[in-house]
């Protein structure tokens, strides 16, 4: 093996080690990366999402408390507690509702490395259950780290079954919502600890029982910072275009019947 090949192997090996050392840090909040945390590592990740802006007043805070566990060098799992607090206009007055939204279990498998391989590749599965609904979220993750640039793409399918008791009987009616998304994100490392970029998200929803469907585009900046002990990532994601909407959204440039005009998400991570 000549000197050039040796230097190439050493550079790739060193880059892979550096990437693994910061694998727990998320540089995006809506877009997943293929990296997993180290075996035996446990991390706490509180996640807060602000959703605001509908035709009438609407503001909601969605909180997820995640406990992430590294199982092997390629596999991790996580457990979530999900909560919300929503204030909105109802019957000409503001009302606030807060509650527990169930639990979730995540599994992520890393198949290829975004530094050592031509591209990173991962598979993601998340199961969620609440008192009256069940969700299954699956996605394919493709990403690449090249110098100071990191790019990532996700394709997601998420069916959700809602179970509604029928009046005056013990029967339960089920309602299926099918969500699918395509995410594209890129960020530039201005320093090893700090990156600045953009996330683009195409969100699609189909509700079979109501013949309701929409397709919208979100896009906005993302910034991330990591220290030795903790990291934080923030995305500001306005809805920028309605690609397709149902009759309820006719005459509007955005979809506000089911979605909001603005989403802001912060994720904070710390090793336990």
Segment roles from a protein language model:
Residues 1-26:
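Cleavable N-terminal export/targeting peptides
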Residues 22-272:
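Transmembrane beta-barrel domains of Gram-negative outer membranes and organellar outer membranes
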